[in-house]
UniProtKB/Swiss-Prot annotation:
Gene Ontology biological-process entries: hydrogen peroxide catabolic process
Disulfide bonding pattern of the chain: none
Key words, A-Z: Heme, Iron, Metal-binding, Oxygen transport, Transport
Occurrences of domain Globin (ranges): 2-142
Gene3D superfamilies xrefs: Globins (1.10.490.10)
Tissue: Red blood cells.
Domain of life assignment: Eukaryota
UniProt-annotated binding residues for heme b: 88
Entry similarity comment: Belongs to the globin family.
PANTHER family associated with the record: HEMOGLOBIN FAMILY MEMBER, HEMOGLOBIN SUBUNIT ZETA
Pfam families hit by this protein: Globin
GO CC aspect terms: blood microparticle; haptoglobin-hemoglobin complex; hemoglobin complex
Protein known as: Hemoglobin subunit alpha-5
Species of the source: Xenopus laevis (African clawed frog)
Amino acid sequence: MTFSSAEKAAIASLWGKVSGHTDEIGAEALERLFLSYPQTKTYFSHFDLSHGSKDLRSHGGKVVKAIGNAATHIDDIPHALSALSDLHAFKLKVDPGNFKLLSHAIQVTLAIHFPAEFNADAQAAWDKFLAVVSAVLVSKYR
């Protein structure tokens, strides 16, 4: 899927603001995911899932940094996320539906932290972008 120049600009602009807060944004998105969809906790039984835990901050940061990697390689997301796709499909065996749930939690978190920047156009671009990221992550499940 290709992105228009306006979509690329919206994604890059917001990523510029998010990139300095990856652990916080990621932890909050994961907390939101786990509160809204408790069944997603099953993959994290070895984590301390309490509010603000080191585990949530660390893993949340990794998630958001991976999204940042995709954002900075927006013209070749499959290559940028290839190793991560392998990990989720072959080792972790995460339910593919969880990526859509996490994408929603991330968008809500972005909207809360960056209300002026996360306008309708930015939301549409990020929704499309995260859908592509999710599709890439589940592409090796087949």
